[in-house]
Amino acid sequence: MSKNNKLNGKDNRQSKIEKLSELKLRHDQLTNELYHLHEYISLVEYDPFYIPNSENYERLLEEKDVTWGSIFQEKKQLHNESSGKKVRRSVRHLRDSGSSTINELDTMSENDINLLKEVDILAKQKLQDLKLQFSNSHIKKKGNTKRAKIVKQVPNHQDKSESPQISERDVKTVVKDLKPNHRGSEIKPEIMESSDVKNEIENCDFNEKQLKLYKDDDIASESDFYFTTSSEDELPNKRRGTIKRRKRINLYVNPPKAVITNPDNIANSHYPTLHEYLDSFKILEDDMTNEEYNTFIKEQQRFAKMIKKGIETGALKYDPVTETVQPSARKVPNMFSHAKVDPIQYMYKEQNLHIHQEHLINQGLFSSKLVQNRKKQRIAGAKKIAQMIEQHFKHIAGAEDRRLKENEKQRKAIARNIIQSVKKRWNLAEKAYRILKKDEEEQLKRIQGKEHLSKMLEKSSKLLGAQLKQHPNEDDIENSTSDDFSSTGDSDNLSSSSDEESDDEINDLSEDQKNNINELKTSSTSAFSSPEISSPSKNPDLGLNSLLTNDFENESNSSDTNEEFIMGDSDTSHSDDENLTDDSEDSNDGEHDTTSDNEKSDLFPADTTNDPLAVQDVPTPSLLRGTLRTYQKQGLNWLASLYNNNTNGILADEMGLGKTIQTISLLSYLACEKHNWGPHLIVVPTSVLLNWEMEFKRFAPGFKVLTYYGNPQQRKEKRKGWNKPDAFHVCIVSYQLIVQDQHSFKRKKWQYMVLDEAHNIKNFRSTRWQALLNFNTQRRILLTGTPLQNNIAELWSLLYFLMPQTVIDGQKVSGFADLDAFQQWFGRPVDKLIETGGTYEQDNETKRTVEKLHQVLRPYLLRRLKADVEKQIPGKYEHIVYCKLSKRQRFLYDDFMSRAQTKATLASGNFMSIVNCLMQLRKVCNHPDLFEVRPIKTSFLFGESVIARYSERANSITRRIHFHDKDTLVDLQNINLQFTNNDLEKTSYHTNTINKLACINEFVEEVQKLRKQNAEEERQKSRHLKINTQNISNFYEEFMQQKLDEQENKINFIGYLNSQRCSRKTVYGMNLIRLLEMPHVSNNCIDDPNYDDLIKPLQTRLLDGRTTIEKFAVLTPGAVTSNIGELTLGMDEFVTPNSKSGIIPYEELVQLDNPFHQVQTKLTIAFPDKSLLQYDCGKLQKLAILLQQLKDGGHRALIFTQMTKVLDILEQFLNYHGYLYMRLDGATKIEDRQILTERFNSDPKITVFILSSRSGGLGINLTGADTVIFYDSDWNPAMDKQCQDRCHRIGQTRDVHIYRFVSEHTIESNILKKANQKRQLDDVIIQKGEFTTDYFSKLSVKDLFGSDVVGDLPVIDTKPLLGSDSEAIKDPKKLEKLLAQAEDEDDVKAANSALREVNVDDEDFDESSTNKTGGNILNGDDIDEDVDEYEGTNHVEEYMLRFIANGFYF
């Protein structure tokens, strides 16, 4: 019994599990359907075999409380209420068999958990079986498929009555995929025959042609992962029992019916079935209606009938090969083309239509692709996760190795730091040892230096004495020193082409030079009666002694020591000014007699031996054209003394004192007196190369000058034949080209080498300095305006360049070859003097050092300032001309300042915005046309419209039709208004008779009386009644009464007309007029002169009135018409030509000149009057008066302006007044610039030269003008200073007046007023020739625009435009860029071009040195501060020093 009970219990448990699994399956299908309807609304893509496993699915079941766990828990809870057990639902459904788990809860027993697991497994197994059965029933049959063969035999002892069982371990059946393999290869299963299993399979419902047996490896190789989808083709890899016939499950879905609340939404079906509805469509095209479709069908039927008829008649025949209809050979009307019909390439819409089944197939294929892609993505994601996990474990496994490597790396780093520290310590010890050794060596050098300095001072004294001595025989000195000087320290490395020549050739050359000098002397004597020199100075004892002594006293006594010895930055202009005046100019000032011997004795006393420092006077060379000033003559004497004493020197006169002419006079002196014609080499900056050539042609035309420039090919042509004797006397070359062609210049021997702007070769380490030092030259002269720089090494480089070795009394002594000693003697005391500015009390050592420096420099340096010779230079006077604004300028100025945008800009304090406002106001001040151009007014031209001609013709026809309407509509004769016709038709007798016979008046009166009586009676009856339309009798009576009233009015009017006609009277009568008529005599000729003015032709009238039209035709109409000729002259093209009337056709009238052209142009276009150009601007009004005064006084003026557009206005102004002028702006080429300046200086008829301040200042010398007019001031004051220097130069013989135009009550006057409060105008604009931002950085908006303009603005306007932290204040170039943004594009280009020209020489001298200036001595400050870290280790340091000193370290 116990066994039976157990068996029954097991059966009951198995049956319960079976029922629960079926319930579980139905539950999953229903919940799946519920979820699909909830998510996708419809069941089109519903898959009953797919159980979703997502958070949304679980959330939905929990919200609806329909989870399987909750149902089971509720049932269990009801069953266990008595026992108090509580079950908590916690079941989760997963899709995969391995992932379907039930959370174990503490409140649930193990039996319940096992039961749920078994139910879940069995339910999923049933679902897989159902899915397999459903998929096999839908496989299409294939005719060529073979029967599936069994892989493994079934045991014979199995009962055949039972259903055969196929183990999933042995066989896996796979449904053949509808889609072929991508590679085109089919899977070939491995087949094993088994008859028993074959019979069992035949008993099943499955079609054997629909199955294939594959090996396990084939399926396993396809995918290592399995993902449950609704469209997978693989069979489940589950173990199943015996294959048996299973029932088909039919699912009936009853979706809930929609609740319709609006009867309009109820669908009324016109077709009972879908098939009938689809048949109702004739064609599946929306564009074609049913009527069009029927028409198309009829056309096709008719076309088919025609083809059939053609075949029957034999006109056409059917070709079965090409399946086309061809025409027969008989001559019948050609209905078709004989050519082969091309196939239709146009795809009609009907060809692209697909049936519903094809759409479903395509959708299935597309879905399959999506499923496969999703599968691949999941596989790829799983692989990535696996790789990440693998890398993680690898990282964990290698952690120990990495730790060991890190420890090893740290140990190496510690060892490296220790090694570096030890090495650094030894380096410091080595530096300390070297410093100690240096100190010892310097101490020895100081002792030796003092001895060497005393020798140098003694040598300088001897040199100065030898320089000032008067040699009795100069030829002997020249011959004795030429050989000695040629053997300099660098002459060993030189080779001269002149060495190849024989001594005979040299002697011949000297004889030729003597002959040439004699010829030039005779020619110069004929051209000039006698050499002229300027008047002597008041001090007769002038000489080098007085100049140098005064300079020394001023330097020693003045507190500002660096003013004399330490000069500032060099001026930007490289061109030396002309220092001579032509003979023609000197003749205007007065005639000078030839200097006699007495005058020479006054200037230079005969007893020169009493003054040891006196300079021997030399005669003015006859080759020099012009007259030297006194200080220039003294410079020539000093240069000649240098030559006579075999000494080189530095001519360091201030810029503008004529270093160029002094150099030319020296070369002329050598040619005339010493018969030394060179060749001489002059090295100048590129910018003044042509200027030097012009100076030689002007003042020394007797020299043959070779200007060395051009491309390499041109320079090679210039070098051809230059080794021949007397090929040239002077060669002028730039610094850049002489370095490039230095090998050619080194091979030639030069007499004199002159370096202009020599302060630019101050870097003795540069290749340029080394190249020039090695040239084969006998003597050298340096020309510079700033010889002494703040760096003593730069001064030494110049002195060493002059005197590498010196010869005194036939002995060679070293010059300034020791830079360290030179710096040791003079560098530190002078640097200390420069740093303090001379404010500290000088000690005796410093004074002695300065005196020694003076003593060393005195023989080699000559410097004069303009302050010393200012009495010999014409004066410069500056005038401020205040100009009132014109009415138009004042209106534009005030309008701009009153704008809200301008006030907002000023209140913002933005620098660029304020500068833009300043630029606009400056334009208004210069000329209002720069701010707002006066417009050219024109009339609005109305063109002829399309309907104009037709409307004009219609109006003409209408006027002609209604021309006589006034005669027909109103008869004026009847109302007696045409009384003049009475005299022409009737006499007075007729009119009187008609008036008497007018008897109708009585009849009319009687009729009126009767009507009046009847009318009064009727009116009294119906006075208070209206027309009654209700009663027909009353209505008729009232209507007739109205009719009688109208008739009465008509009779009254006729009576009125009759009375008017009968009352006509004549004034004179026809008989009187006939008596007074006189016979008419025709005469076609009229001799009255008054009639001649009336019959003048149109052209004559216009010619006579041309003057009147020119003066008074000033009003321009607002609009004019384009066909004015047709309207005024009758030039209408619609006038039909008539030979009798003589009307000219329109085509001929068009060819005629328009006689009204002048009037039309004058009245249509109004140009501004030319005089308004002057009267619109206050500055031009002042300029007109000033130019007239200057022209009357014989002066010539230069007008400068910053803006290029102002030059255009000035051109119009000068043309209007008829002045001869020339123009030079930034667009003028450099080669044209020299031509313009020479023409202006040579032609006194040219009164004005207008220039742009941005036109560049190199090579421009306008000494022909004595007046400078600044129309406006430039942003950059250095530009204005440069403009002044173009006129106020040494070559100027007259005083220079500078006029600066300033507009009153504007920003210009405010800036000038503020500047005058701080300093004088010259100091504000010019600060040593550099651009200054002082007046910009210190001016505020209130200072610029005035207190009345910015009175209501914030406090920010009282602050400076640029703050103290602004970069523009620190860097002037940045300020220039900011100001350039507010200027016009042409002005900015001109300014940049001018700056490039000024800085072109910087490129020649821009050469970075290999090493920095200064010695390599290491001071104690160079030691690193890390020494403090080793405090307390002095014994180690002492040991290291002893170790190094004993020689063990090296």
UniProtKB/Swiss-Prot annotation:
Disulfide pairings: none
GO biological process: chromatin remodeling; recombinational repair
Biased composition (Acidic residues): 498-510, 578-588
Region annotation (Disordered) ranges: 469-618, 1400-1424
Domain Helicase C-terminal: from-to ranges: 1179-1332
Keywords: Activator, ATP-binding, Chromatin regulator, DNA-binding, Helicase, Hydrolase, Nucleotide-binding, Nucleus, Transcription, Transcription regulation
Annotated ATP binding sites: 653-700
Domain (HSA): residue spans on this chain: 344-417
First-tier enzyme category under EC: hydrolase
Stored InterPro entries: Helicase_ATP-bd, Helicase_C-like, HSA_dom, INO80/SWR1_helicase, P-loop_NTPase, SNF2-like_sf, SNF2/RAD54-like_C, SNF2_N
Biased segments, Basic and acidic residues type: 589-602
Biased composition range(s): Low complexity: 480-497, 523-540, 549-560
Domain of life of the organism encoding this protein: Eukaryota
Compartments it resides in: Nucleus
Catalytic activity: ATP + H2O = ADP + phosphate + H(+)
Sequence motif DEAH box, location on chain: 756-759
Record domain Helicase ATP-binding: where: 640-805
Function: Catalytic component of the SWR1 complex which mediates the ATP-dependent exchange of histone H2A for the H2A variant HZT1 leading to transcriptional regulation of selected genes by chromatin remodeling.
Assembly information from the UniProt record: Component of the SWR1 chromatin-remodeling complex.
Protein name, as recorded: Helicase SWR1
Name of the gene: SWR1
